Structures are given as structure tokens and as C-alpha cells.
Amino acid sequence: MSVLIDTNVMLDIALKREPFFQNSALALAKARAAGDTLLCATSITTLHYFMHKKLGEAGARRFITDCLQAMTLAPVKRSSIQLALGSDMHDFEDGVIAHCAAECGAHIIITRDTVDYAKSPITALTPTEYLNTQ
């Protein structure tokens, strides 16, 4: 099963944000064990920005390198952006991520922001909901 990990879940893990860290980390581990884990290309710059503030440039680059080695990067295509522009999703960034996930064949998006993914072409689950699936 292919699962896309949303930016906010990756930040919860990277920054060890409580009370979200544990379930986010467990959900990522479960997704990796179950198949392909995807990270949208748009997430990379956001992750770098926050990790740079915490770890400095070398640490941020090391973190991004680790992400690229552990996960498949979902490219942002023109079609993903066009679909997001025409979608009923209220948050454009989430729309781009959702359509990238769909175009890459993801089955699930793991996010803490399931409300903004209500009209996503891919089912969105919180880390806790994902942990409770078979």
C-alpha cells in the first residue's frame, strides 16, 4: 500500500512536537513497513525551513537527505496544480498535495488536518486513525 505523509506529520516527527510525536512516528513506521511511503516535493522546502531553524544548515540538509533516502518523492506536476486550482478543496497547498498523491497512486494521506482533506480524491486519516486500521 502506498501512503503519502503530509508535511504536518513530518514536522511533528522531526520537531518531536507533543502531543503528536508518538502517534506520528508510529504511523510513519507502520506505513514504511506496509509499502511505499511518499513525501510531496512541496514538503521538502517547508521541512528544510523548520529544520534549519532547529539544527542549522548542515543538520537541515542531513534531515532532507535522510527523508529522500527513506521515502519516495512525489513530484509536483502541472496537472496536480491545475487539478488543485479547480478542486473544491479550500486549502490550495493541501489540494496540491492531495492531487500529487492521487497522481502517484497513493491509497491514503496521513495528516493531522483531515478537515482540509474532506474533498480530497484520496482518503485522509490522522496518524491515530491510521494506526487503528488493519
PLM features: residue spans?
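Short, well-structured N-terminal submotif of metal-dependent ribonuclease cores
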Residues: M1-L39, K54-R62, K119, E129-Q134
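PIN-domain endoribonuclease scaffold, especially VapC-family toxins
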Residues: N23-D91, G95, H99
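Acidic active-site catalytic centers that drive phospho-/nucleotidyl reactions
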Residues: D6, D94, D113
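Alpha-helix N-cap/helix-start and coil->helix boundary motif
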Residues: M10, I44-T45, E103
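Residue-level signal for well-ordered alpha-helical positions
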Residues: K16-R17, F50, S87, S120-T123
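Acidic, PIN/NYN-like endoribonuclease modules and their adjacent C-terminal/linker elements
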Residues: S2, L26, A70, H99-Q134
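Flexible, active-site-adjacent loop/turn segments at secondary-structure boundaries
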Residues: L11, H90, V115
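Short beta-strands and strand-loop turn motifs
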Residues: N8, T42, R78-S79, I110-R112
